[in-house]
């Protein structure tokens, strides 16, 4: 099967590798290199790097809907278009007559949008999964060809869930491409939206419930990441669970938990500014954190 693959993030890599092994990937379309890091040097997307490593045809348009790009894609005469975390909306001209499918990181119609993995943890879902849908002009609104479901771990972060969901993609995509392509329509009455995130979304208020705060910390880890100032140090919170013990909001209690509006937070893992990730116990021992110290949310 001749395939054009469109993707930019690491989420699509496992599926792309499988498609390259079992089918003919005629071209890979990805976002152009962007400046990143302290040196501000342009960096290719993970998908672009893989294309170069495998000597596959690579297209990196600023605008996928540019007529020249559309014409170039059509000239490939591919059988199928597979889209995973590409980052641009595709016009009907791009989709054309291809049998086109998209791998989305939720059980649609729940969590349409740019941040479904984060939303599933932050909102307290017990299960999630991936969906393979047809390409549609409305965001994530296509016909559902297949799904794969997993449970969300009690201490699982968005980064960890991302990797587990990405690993579900290859088998499901292959099943859809080689199967009978039966589908179901999405129920528009059940649609929920997971909009694109910003750093502001991860700002926390210690007056909130410990259950809510723990989900935010895990759901926004590793990015955009919740922060607290602890012993005068800006700390990125990576993993936490709620505790029923209560105290004065923001204070570190005798058991090491941080008192919040309802209950307390047990920080399991954090990353102080300028340091590597570490456990809460290692942080407290190294910084000589004292019971009764006050923590402040970083705005």
Annotated model-derived regions:
Residues 13, 17, 71-74, 92, ...:
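Amphipathic, non-transmembrane alpha-helical secondary structure
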Residues 7, 28, 51, 173, ...:
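Residue-level signal for inorganic ion chemistry
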């Amino acid at each position: 099967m001749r395939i054009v693959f469109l993707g930019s993030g690491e989420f699509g890599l496992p599926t792309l590798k499988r498609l390259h092994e079992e089918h003919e990937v005629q071209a890979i379309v990805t976002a152009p290199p962007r400046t990143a890091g302290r040196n501000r040097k342009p960096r290719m997307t993970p998908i672009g790097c893989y294309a170069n490593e495998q000597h596959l045809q690579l297209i990196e348009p600023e605008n996928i809907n540019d007529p020249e790009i559309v014409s170039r894609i059509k000239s490939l005469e591919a059988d199928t278009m597979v889209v995973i975390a590409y980052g641009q909306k595709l016009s009907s001209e791009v989709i054309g007559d291809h049998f086109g499918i998209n791998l989305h990181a939720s059980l649609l119609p729940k969590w349409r949008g740019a941040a479904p993995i984060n939303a599933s943890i932050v909102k307290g879902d017990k299960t999630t999964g991936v969906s393979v849908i047809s390409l549609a002009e409305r965001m994530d609104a296509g016909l559902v060809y297949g799904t794969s479901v997993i449970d969300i771990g009690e201490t699982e972060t968005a980064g960890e869930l991302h990797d587990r969901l990405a690993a579900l993609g290859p088998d499901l995509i292959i099943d859809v491409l080689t199967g009978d392509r039966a589908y179901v329509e999405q129920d528009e009455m059940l649609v929920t939206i997971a909009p694109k995130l910003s750093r502001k979304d991860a700002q926390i208020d210690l007056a909130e419930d410990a259950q809510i705060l723990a989900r935010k910390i895990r759901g926004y880890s590793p990015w955009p990441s919740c922060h607290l100032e602890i012993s005068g140090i800006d700390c990125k919170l990576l993993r936490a669970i709620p505790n029923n013990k209560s105290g004065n909001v923001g204070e570190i209690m005798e058991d090491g938990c941080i008192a919040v509006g309802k209950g307390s937070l047990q920080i399991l893992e954090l990353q102080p500014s300028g340091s590597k990730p570490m456990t809460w116990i290692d942080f407290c021992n190294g910084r000589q954190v004292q019971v009764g110290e006050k923590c402040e949310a970083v705005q």
